[in-house]
Amino acid sequence: MPSPGTERDGKIFRHRLSTRLWHWINAVAVIVLLMSGLTISNAHPRLYWGHYGANFDAAWLTLPRFPGWATIPTGYNLALAREWHFAFAWVFAFGLLFFMLRALMNGHFRRDIALGVKDVVPSHLWQDVKRHLRLNFETPGGGYNLLQKITYSLVLFVLLPLLILTGLTLSPGMNAVLPWLIDLFGGRQSARSIHFICAGGMALFIAVHLVLVVLAGPINEVRSMITGWFRVKGEQS
């Protein structure tokens, strides 16, 4: 298998097999988690802070009831939704662990995602923002641009771990094994609120990600995530 950065016939090898597998498996897992999570939310669409929250407590946010077409299962079935959620949560968690270990071993983090000293200079960030506003997403060598690095770092090292840890906190079985998690997040209801906020952040990330894929050229972007090869600008057919 070629190394990332290898050039051939106007294309650059961009994604290793481990990255591509994780991307598509994770995409399925996240969709199932979000849709089953909406069913779970429908059971009590109110969010609280602290250890307790019930019908007569003051909620900081009241959520809408989500329609059947947006939920798994499509009909209201809380027990089945929890089974779907729990099963794919393990796929999600172990998939993230596998990806992180592989990315550390093969240099993906260091080469493509890690932020250097020059990356955090405000002028560089502003230049990257202006390039995005002009719909110019190209970078030398076909690598990730600065906004991608920042976003992927926040998602991989903040958003996804928070989703997993707060999800574990909401599991009564895990409370017996890891009772300190409840105190870490300031109570079960606080963990539930943080979990929902992070899930909303994940949904927003996916929406923006899909829009940018379309704007950057969906055929080339999707092909690179299937085959690993990304056609550079000026060589596209």
Regions found by a protein language model. Name each.
Residues 1-237:
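Membrane-embedded alpha-helical bundles that constitute the cytochrome b-like, heme-associated redox core
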